[in-house]
């Protein structure tokens, strides 16, 4: 198995072409030295034990984002496995299986605006209506950063100091100032972009500067990604769309990276299992 230019992320197996053997999905996680640009994932067809690149599904998986988790599941109830992807700084993607050819139906299901730093994904019929629901894990609601559709987190990225490497600036609208402001201090920004020390001679000069003012004269407009949700979320399958329901408050106290769905207590209902906690090495994401 080859042809992957990114670091390898999630793996998933299913007989998606209906020939009786298990085929392989290889998720693209991160492009080395190019985070957070979207990676490309791949499907490999199982041909009598030899895996060959599925060229028919190349386009639908090109630059689908930084895939952190994946699961095959019959989301549309037509009898074949569809592909569900959790992406970082992106949506939970659903790729519908149409006789071995996949179609990205994320937008038509109303999921394209539900962007997060999604870590894990699993499926199961959580409300007993016969339809496969999705559970996606995120960073929870107990950390230093919060996000909402009206006040999203934004990640600006580009070669701002023109040294051939990507620079990153995390930003959010300051509720008091009503302006889009960086979420890192001047010292951290100046370490990554030394030219700022020439532009801002004092902390006072920098303190009230918006993202537009800081990055406005760095050349080409920066690329930007947005996160509108950080909650661990149940996506209820309503047939033609999904309804987002946050998991209970106790589940939101820490990030979660793996999620499993099964009847753990034997009562006939599907339950949700989360693995949680995060030990950070870089501020502001302390241990939680």
Predicted features, each with a name:
Residues 1-288:
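Acidic, glycine/proline-rich Ca2+-coordinating loop motifs
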């Amino acid at each position: 198995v080859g042809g992957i230019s990114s670091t390898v992320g999630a793996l998933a197996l299913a007989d998606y072409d209906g020939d009786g053997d298990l085929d392989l999905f290889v998720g693209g996680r991160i492009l080395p030295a190019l985070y957070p640009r979207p990676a490309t994932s791949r499907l490999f067809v199982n041909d009598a034990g030899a895996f060959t690149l599925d060229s028919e599904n190349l386009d639908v998986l090109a630059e689908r984002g930084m895939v952190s988790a994946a699961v095959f599941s019959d989301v549309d109830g037509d009898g074949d496995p569809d592909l569900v992807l959790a992406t970082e700084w992106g949506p939970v993607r659903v790729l519908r299986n149409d006789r071995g050819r996949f179609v990205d139906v994320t937008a038509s299901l109303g999921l394209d605006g539900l962007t997060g730093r999604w870590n894990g994904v699993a499926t199961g019929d959580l409300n007993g209506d016969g339809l496969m629901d999705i559970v996606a894990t995120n960073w929870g609601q107990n950390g230093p950063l919060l996000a909402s559709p009206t006040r999203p987190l934004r990640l600006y990225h580009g070669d701002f100091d023109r040294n051939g490497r990507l620079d990153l600036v995390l930003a959010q609208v300051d509720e008091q100032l009503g302006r889009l402001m960086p979420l890192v201090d001047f010292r951290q920004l100046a370490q990554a972009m030394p030219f700022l020390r020439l532009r801002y001679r004092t902390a006072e000069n920098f303190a009230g500067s918006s993202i537009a003012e800081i990055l406005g004269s760095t050349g080409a407009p920066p690329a930007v990604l947005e996160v509108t949700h950080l909650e661990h979320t149940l996506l209820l399958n309503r047939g033609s769309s999904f309804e987002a329901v946050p998991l209970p408050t106790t589940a939101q106290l820490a990030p979660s990276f793996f999620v499993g769905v099964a009847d753990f207590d034997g009562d006939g209902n599907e339950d949700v299992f989360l693995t949680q906690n995060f030990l950070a090495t870089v501020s502001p994401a302390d241990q939680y």
